[in-house]
C-alpha cells in the first residue's frame, strides 16, 4: 500500500498529519482519540512494508481490521 492510500485511510479514521518542520521522507501522524503519535515513511510510489504499517497502526492505537475497512 502506498503512502497516499495510507494517509487517506488515516484521515478517514480521524488521525491528523502534523506539520512538517523540515524536508525529509518521513511524516508524523497523531491520533486525537488515543493521544498517541507515530512516524510513517513517505516513499512516494514505493509500497510501505506491511510490518512497518502494522507497527505504526499499533502505536496509534488502531486495529488492523478497522484500518482495512476505512
Predicted feature descriptions by range:
Residues 1-14:
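Polyanion-binding surface elements
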Residues 5, 17-20, 54-57:
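Alpha-helical interaction segments
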Residues 6-9, 20, 32, 63:
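Short amphipathic alpha-helical "recognition" segments used for binding
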Residues 17-51:
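A short, structured beta-strand/loop element
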Residues 36, 44-70:
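C-terminal structural segments of small proteins and small subunits
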Amino acid at each position: 500500500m502506498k503512502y497516499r492510500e495510507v494517509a487517506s485511510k488515516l484521515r478517514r479514521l480521524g488521525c491528523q498529519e502534523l506539520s512538517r518542520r523540515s524536508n525529509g521522507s518521513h511524516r508524523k501522524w497523531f491520533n486525537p482519540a488515543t493521544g498517541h503519535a507515530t512516524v510513517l515513511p513517505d516513499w512516494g510510489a514505493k509500497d510501505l512494508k506491511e510490518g512497518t504499517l502494522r507497527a505504526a497502526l499499533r502505536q496509534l492505537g488502531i486495529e488492523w481490521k478497522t484500518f482495512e475497512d476505512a
